[in-house]
Structure formats: structure tokens, C-alpha cells
């Protein structure tokens, strides 16, 4: 496996993007993370109206 420190150092130091977006494969990791994070944040918010009205989830 070749040592790519110099190439990566040039990429990271010459880029004006935020640090977490500088790597060439960062979109591969960040877009799925953002999607899962959005679902994890929004899903509990969908249950708030039922919680306010006192409606419990149906048991299967």
C-alpha cells in the first residue's frame, strides 16, 4: 500500500472547504450520515402530537 501522506496533505491544505468535506470520499460518508441523522431527529417529532393528546402506540 502506497504512502499517500503528501498527496492528502496537499488536498487538505489547498482546499477552502470545511475540514469534514475535504477528503475526496467525504460525500460517501457524510450524505448517508446526514440522512440517518435527519430520520433520527424527525421521527420522534412525529409522535409529539399523539403524546400531547395522550394517545398510546398500538401493541402488536
Swiss-Prot record:
Compartments reported by the entry: Mitochondrion inner membrane
Membrane-topology annotation of the record: Single-pass membrane protein
Membrane topology (Mitochondrial intermembrane): 54-60
UniProt xrefs under InterPro entries: Cox7_yeast (IPR014367), COX7a (IPR039297)
Keyword Ribosomal protein carried by entry: no
One cellular component term from this protein's GO annotations in UniProt: mitochondrial membrane
Other noteworthy facts: Present with 639 molecules/cell in log phase SD medium.
Protein name: Cytochrome c oxidase subunit 7, mitochondrial
Organism: Saccharomyces cerevisiae (strain ATCC 204508 / S288c) (Baker's yeast)
